[in-house]
Amino acid sequence: MEPRVVKPPGQDLVVERLKSRYGLGGSCPDEYDFSNFDQSKCKRRTLTSPGDLDIYSGDKVGSSLKYSDESKHCRTPLCSLFKRVNVNCLDDELDSFHDLKKRETEEELIENDYRVSTSKITKQSFKDIEKVALPTNTTSSRPRTECCSDAGDSPLKLVSYPKSRASDKRSLLPRQISQIYDELFQIHLKLQCETAAQQKFAEELQKRERFLLEREQLLFRHEDALSKIKGVEEEVLTRFQIMKEQHDAEVEHLTEVLKEKNKETKRLRSSFDALKELNDTLKKQLNEASEENRKMDIQAKRVQARLDNLQRKYEFMTIQRLKGSSHAVHEMKSLKQEKAPVSKTYKVPLNGQVYELLTVFMDWISDHHLSKVKHEESGMDGKKPQLKFASQRNDIQEKCVKLLPLMTEQLQWMPFVNTKLHEPFVKFIYWSLRQLDAGAQHSTMTSTLRRLGEDIFKGVVTKGIQDSSPQHSVENKPKTAAFFKSSNLPLRFLSTLIVLKTVTQADYLAQAFNSLCLDLKTEEGKTLFLEYQAVPVILSHLRISSKGLLSNVIDSLLQMTVESKSLQPFLEACSNSSFFRTCSVLLRAPKLDLQILEKLSTILQKLSKIKSNKKLFELFTIHLMLQEIQRTTNPEHAFLCINLNSTLFNLGLTKCNSLVSSASH
């Protein structure tokens, strides 16, 4: 951007002021009148140096002020001086002033601070010029020949006069003009310096303007960026608000989840505390039971020692009594004869394959002949067996009666035989005993069966071969054959059933039923129970007379009612008249224990699901007894009531039950 050009005030009056200064104005109207001056009569001279314009353009305002202040003092001398100057010279000077006026209108207005300083310098210079001009004008009356030379830089160029008059004036004018020229030249130099400073200042202003333009463009860019940032800020604030709402919702959700977790933790802690207290109580009870058990063991040892002492005392007293009798010797001999077979030594036959062959025959006979008792028992449900089967059964029973004593004696040889052969041998004994159930009881077999049961329960312990010579008096280690206490499950299961068939001692039977309950907890035990048709064996003990064993018997049957693949075959095996007859007799017993009644009701409830058993329930009037028990049962016994209701519902007697209860009310 170029700096603005401003005309200084009063620029049109510069020429008039110069006229008034040199006496060409209104002070000398009679002598010189330049108002109607014809400019075409004079040659206009141009400035030869570009610095001429700078002299007059440097300080226009300051010069005009100076002239206005001092025109009063120097008007008269200058008028007298210029009266002597030729008119042509004045015309040339006037033309120069007109050119100066035109050039001054094209100059630029300089900064105010530079004007003031330049004005002061110009005033001082003109004061010096006036001091020099005053004495000169008073003494000299000759006109000037020249104003200035053509080669100078002064603003007024002088014109040479005719040679006749120039020689007279050359002694006075050059010295004064040269002084004015020197002063003006000094002013010109100062003005050049000021012009250079002003140009430099203008360049600085241009640089500053360019800098401001750049700053303005940068400001515009910043404004655009700020507007964009404002839009982005609004979007960011919106998204931030959305994220804040999502965060608040998530925090609220997590707070709710944390509260639920805290509640669950509190519940778990309370449950854990309850379990811990229960565990501590059980530990305390266990410690008390252990202490009591230890005391009971000590007491049992003492009782056993006392019993041994009493037995020895009884034997001693018996011997003392027998000494006084006449047949004491005979009794002693009989006792020795009874003890002799026990201490007798046995020799194992050399051919062991005979036992293997016998066991094969025993398996064959047991599986294909003796186990047919199942079909005969199934014919007991109101159907008489055929005659040919009856004759065959009698023959089998007679043969079994003959074989059982021999097989009981052979048990003494079992320790010397391979343990793999024990199972077929015991299986043959079991099925032989089962054949005797169908026929009449033989009184001659009582002692044999008791001995057989004791040997199976206790096992057989025999001594090895013993030589009578003194050098071979050392006996071999004793050999045992365990049946009831065997680790083999099939052999132990068969031995348990044989003990239940033959033994009458309550402690042996209790141990046998405990072992049977443990074996029935496994699937293999349940399979063996069905394979060996053990339901009739259990039913023989399901009677009210044996109250001590009744709970164990019911537990054995209850183990078979657990949900498994053996449940349905077991229920079919119990769906016969013998089982329902036994249950009917048991239910008729007065003051039957509540636990036994609950267990029995569970078995009957499962049997009632089979539709064909409804006839057996009605045949033995079990449904009526169940209705009576339901009517008299305390409602607090919820388990028993549920089983009875379910059984009656399966039999289709629920409505009848409601009618009976309403009639009783």
Swiss-Prot record:
> Which residues are recorded as modified (Phosphothreonine)?
48
UniProt key word Ubl conjugation? no
Coiled-coil ranges from the UniProt annotation:
198-323
Q: Which UniProt keywords apply?
A: Coiled coil, Phosphoprotein
The keyword Phosphoprotein belongs to this UniProt entry's keyword annotation: yes
Chain positions found as Phosphoserine: 49, 469
The record, for Pfam families, names: CCDC138_C (PF21035), CCDC138_cc (PF21037)
Q: Entry's PANTHER family? A: COILED-COIL DOMAIN-CONTAINING PROTEIN 138 (PTHR34523:SF1)
Protein name, as recorded: Coiled-coil domain-containing protein 138
